[in-house]
Amino acid sequence: MTATAQQLEFLKNSIKSIQDYPKPGILFRDVTSLLEDPKAYALSIELLVERYKNAGITKVVGTEARGFLFGAPVALGLGVGFVPVRKPRKLPRETIAETYELEYGTDQLEIHVDAIKPGDNVLVVDDLLATGGTIEATVKLIRRLGGKVTDAAFIINLFDLGGEQRLEKQGITCYSLVPFPGH
């Protein structure tokens, strides 16, 4: 099943836009409204599974926290394992960490050292692509463990914030279901 224009418009219409959140001048795209509609949620998962079902994916990685909501069901649909990437001190076993830049400071992500095996073909899934910093850090973690990652999938791409171009420089092909301008 290839996504039709009608299906993609349905998904776009299921995402509410909130003006001046979290601060004045921002138009926030709220993917949780898509989750509230079981038809929209199911369709988003079906379309991602369909796109990657023959790609030889061996693991799906989702980044905290909304990446879990889309990554885990995509992994189930592909019949592969799901690996969470989390904020510091949230994973119980041995981890490695990657620090990345934020607008004002830094943050860090962690992954279990035994979650990705050398040669794993990994798909990264998240709810939204903005500047690409979080996904770039996630990709670095996967590659440090010997995983191969060439693709990242998103529900929303805020296309004018430069995330897709940033990730392309890292050899990542980005796919998103719903494009929006970023604010």
From Swiss-Prot:
Highest taxon of source: Bacteria
Subcellular localization: Cytoplasm
Listed pathway(s): Purine metabolism; AMP biosynthesis via salvage pathway; AMP from adenine: step 1/1
Top-tier EC class: transferase
One Gene Ontology molecular-function label: adenine phosphoribosyltransferase activity
Pfam families according to UniProt: Pribosyltran
Keywords, sorted A to Z: Cytoplasm, Glycosyltransferase, Purine salvage, Transferase
Keyword Nucleotide-binding: no
A GO CC term attached to the entry: cytosol
HAMAP family in the cross-refs: Aden_phosphoribosyltr
Quaternary structure (record): Homodimer.
The protein, known as: Adenine phosphoribosyltransferase
Source species: Salmonella typhimurium (strain LT2 / SGSC1412 / ATCC 700720)
